[in-house]
Amino acid sequence: MKILIVDDHPLIREALRHVLAVLDADIALIEAQNFAEGLAAASDNPNLDLILLDLGLPDADGIDALTELRRHYPAVPTVVLSASEHPATVMRAIEAGAMGFIPKTTSSHLLLNALRLVLSGGVYLPTEVLRQHQGTPEPALRLAVEASDGGKMLTPREIGLTARQADVLALLVQGKPNKLICRELDVAEGTVKIHVTAILKALNVTNRTQAVIAVGKLGLQLRQI
């Protein structure tokens, strides 16, 4: 397993080295202390499994850096590390394509669980931040919070999705538009639109960003495509 850490704080990188060592027996960690180094490292290591990106880099706006990484490396899940837990920051990161948002105050145990979820195709979001942002959630999201609190992880089938809709959702949470989804799944774009409509209805949300939030709350482990 190969992970790129982009963070300008040496102590944070050192702490991550110790924590991530137990994630995989054959782990390789590549480190960069600014965004320019991070882009170069990503280019030099084409088989990355995960990118951990600090939003507070000295040489780039955090969301702009995330957007650029997603544009160049859409197949590599990127998880945001941030000193901020503000709901607006979480939302901006998710809208930019992050597959996870982990506050730097997160415990080592929770960090590892979050990364395992992302590596298995899921999305990790801090539940308490989402609760604050959502206020009174829609029924499907309320069910998701309850499932998260109780340790139970719902499957796509349990929320009424077919296997094909689950595949569409897996690509949707990666930030891919309908044209790319239909190409990767070899189906008509009109069919993808029908599936997306069904997915939003099943999650009781109205747009893709809300769908990603719902996936994070449900802890859905979607198939990696």
Question: Each predicted region: which residue ranges?
Answer:
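Conserved active-site segment of CheY-like receiver
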Residues: D8, L81-E85, K104-T106
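Acidic, metal-coordinating helix/loop segments flanking the phosphotransfer/catalytic sites
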Residues: Q33-L50
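Active-site residues of response regulator receiver
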Residues: D54-L55, S82
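Recognition helix of helix-turn-helix DNA-binding domains
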Residues: G175-Q210
